[in-house]
Amino acid sequence: MTTTDIVPVGDTAAAPAKAAIYSFGEPASVLDRREIGQYFEMWHNGRWYEPPLPMGKLAQTFNMSPYHRSAIALKVNLLVAQQTSTAWLSSDAFERFALDFLQMGNGYLEWIPNRAGRLARADHAPALNLRPGVDPGKFWFVNGPLGDIHEFDVGRVFQLQQPDVMQEIFGMPEWLASLQAGLLSENATLFRRRYYLNGAHAGFVFYLSETLADQETADALQEKLGQAKGVGNFKNMLVHIPGGKKDGIQIMPIADVTAKDEFSNVKTLSRDDMLAAHRTPPQLIGIVPTNNGGFGKVTEARDAFYETEIVPIARRMLRMNEWFGVPLLAFADYICTDGSIIRQEGSGFRKILAG
């Protein structure tokens, strides 16, 4: 149901009111801006180092785009599918460790000792809260500026990093080059949502060329327009000007988004940037091809992706076995479409050709 506002207008023969220019509508907010580049520095408080990027912000980017989340989830799923549980490392702990390593650039496992002081199990420690200590081998659990703080014993936390060329205290995720593309994609989606919630237009200019009776009439119009804020905010308004002209009042749209729409181009280009950063075949994360030839066979793309991307990640993760001193992590054979086998052998992998 719409609301009608009636604004009375006095005798137009009176002295004309002075010209008034009034802007209305809230500025469109954005998720993040270029200031994120200012975070690339490190400092310590005497006990632990702070990361070069806020870990809370980095965690929030996990959901900035379906392409980014799907690419991360694909790698985690392939690792989890091949991981074999051991007495020291559960599937759940490994999955959380793998997700942290790929999204946050750091994966942590805590050494849980038994009564004899030997390894009972390795448990996941969240990268969001772990901070390397200033003292070598020491780590801290920090739950925000005012939250709980826990100091781990020296040698109780295993850290696996994605190397960063600027420093060696924290790892940085290699997909970071596509961060701005992901945020651009999200901003484009948020703008489009606001466009539809705004009545399918991007704002307009209320142009009034009629001579009004007095300044109070212009103020009344301004007040009624200023009340049109928020979702479902547009109201009907009756303006009666005796002897007025046909085009005395005009509503002129600022932009016709339906006619000049860059939304699809922005989404496509930002998607390509993210897929390039993740080196992920598009058919493996549900992207529909727009060409007649398609993307090729999914199985062949999966095999190539596993060999070129998943195997190097798994090799890095196998370093935990040497650190813990036990075969903590192991991977099952991966059977390729052509019958060849990618098999773990010690801390590496070997491809056994079919036949």
Where are these regions (language model features)?
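Flexible, gly/proline-biased loop segments at the beginnings
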Residues: 1-132, 169-172, 257, 294-297, ...
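Extended, charged amphipathic alpha-helical segments
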Residues: 2-12, 75, 80, 142-143, ...
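A short alpha->loop->secondary-structure connector
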Residues: 127-136, 140, 147
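Generic beta-strand structural signal
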Residues: 107-109, 137, 202-204
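Hydrophobic residues embedded in beta-strands of well-ordered beta-sheets
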Residues: 119, 137-140, 249
